[in-house]
UniProtKB/Swiss-Prot annotation:
Record-annotated disulphide pairs: none
Native source species: Synechocystis sp. (strain ATCC 27184 / PCC 6803 / Kazusa)
Family: Belongs to the queuine tRNA-ribosyltransferase family.
Domain of life of the source: Bacteria
Broadest EC class assigned to this enzyme: transferase
Protein name as it appears in the record: Queuine tRNA-ribosyltransferase
Cellular component terms per the entry's GO annotation: cytoplasm; cytosol
Region (RNA binding): 253-259, 277-281
Length: 374
């Protein structure tokens, strides 16, 4: 088994006295990540519509890219020849690549699952692709992100117990193969993923097995695949405290205000979600916990900033009326400006929670967001 790298450490700086929340610093070869922290998603080595310089201005520290999509286009060989994904996309900060498992398992009509891995047809050109734990790690080693994810089987949110039990057991066996295949433990941290669906005993069993492997970090997967918010919350509140306190904890695919606040309450450190850019591309702004449709006529003659408290380029430069005009005109700039703001908004939200944890006022300051979902 590859030895954990000294290049990756997690230091807890403060703990909330009324919850499991903690503020810390996750050190990587490309710099520190102050936690808790929201990570923007750059699926194809680009956060949609945003330049790396603009992304840095949002205070983003760590960015996620997608192994499955980059394998299909342009291919890991081209990215490796460029010097790795950081140089390829012009981003100098920490990066994480997911394993491609979630995307592969979403191709329900195009794939075949076996103990070796998943055989699927590329939705781009129809060619057969054999994605195994070894191949996923090989691709991620070539991409060169700081954090890489184990190849896992992500069962449907409402899958029956036998299906989830089998998927969870296979995820562990695949993790062991990922560890053996990992060629760059010195500069890439391999995180394991706790699966188990909505069955808390399976989550406990999976967490116990992963902890025994002493990995550099741990993720909770399978919580953004169609479950009700209350079920997601139940799983996170149960699972997060089981994970080692001296390692970073990552909740995959979650990025709403309440879900992040509740997860931080349980001890989660890192989040990723496509919400900021997806909403931006549909003319929706995230403003202090609310969703605003900038196409609405109410903004047509509103010359105030989108959010007077926000330091982002959009809010410091343009009015609601201008944004309304851009969205109504279907101008690309409108979608870009809203995406910039939305990314900044969710990063600021996790930054403000971090500061509240340092001040030990988290449960008071964010009580509104800590009510369990129904």
């Amino acid at each position: 088994m590859p030895l954990p790298s000294v290049n990756f450490t997690y230091q807890c700086q403060a703990r909330c006295s009324h919850s499991q929340a903690r503020a810390g610093i996750f050190q990587t070869p490309h710099g520190p990540v102050e936690t808790p922290r929201f990570m923007p998603v750059g699926t194809l080595a680009t956060v949609k519509g945003i330049t790396p310089a603009q992304l840095a201005d949002t205070q983003a520290q760590m960015v996620l890219a997608n192994t499955y999509h980059l394998h299909l286009q342009p291919g890991e060989k081209i990215i490796a020849a460029a010097g790795g994904v950081h140089k390829f996309m012009g981003w100098s900060g920490p990066m994480l690549t997911d394993s491609g498992g979630f995307q592969v398992f979403s191709l329900s009509q195009l794939r075949t699952i076996g103990e070796q891995g998943v055989l699927f047809r590329s939705p781009r050109d129809g060619r057969l692709i054999d994605m195994t734990p070894e191949n996923s790690i090989r691709i991620q080693n070539a991409l060169g992100a700081d954090v890489i994810m184990a190849f896992d089987e992500c069962p449907p949110g409402q899958g029956d117990r036998l299906m989830v039990e089998q998927a969870t057991a296979r995820t562990y066996r695949w993790l062991e193969r990922c560890i053996e295949a990992h060629q760059r433990p010195g500069d890439q941290a391999l995180f394991g993923i706790v699966q188990g669906g909505t069955y808390l005993d399976l989550r406990s069993q999976a967490a116990e097995q992963l902890i025994a492997l002493d990995l550099p970090g741990y993720a909770i997967g399978g919580v953004s695949v169609g479950e009700a918010p209350a079920l997601i919350d139940k799983v996170v509140q149960h699972t997060a405290p089981l994970l080692p306190a001296h390692k970073p904890r990552y909740l995959m695919g979650v990025g709403t205000y309440r879900e992040m606040a509740r997860a931080i309450f349980a001890g989660i450190d890192l989040f990723d979600c496509v919400i900021p850019t997806r909403f931006g591309r549909h003319g929706t702004a995230l403003v202090q916990g609310e969703r605003w449709n900038l196409k609405n006529a109410t903004f047509r003659e509103d010359h105030r900033p989108l959010d007077e408290t926000c330091p982002c380029y959009t809010c410091q430069t343009f009015s609601r009326a201008y944004l309304n005009h851009l969205i109504r005109s279907r101008e690309m700039l409108g979608y870009i400006l809203l995406s910039l703001h939305n990314i900044t908004e969710l990063i600021r939200f996790t930054q403000s929670i971090r500061q509240a944890i340092l001040n030990d006022t988290f449960t008071q300051d964010f009580a509104h967001w800590l009510t369990p979902p129904e």
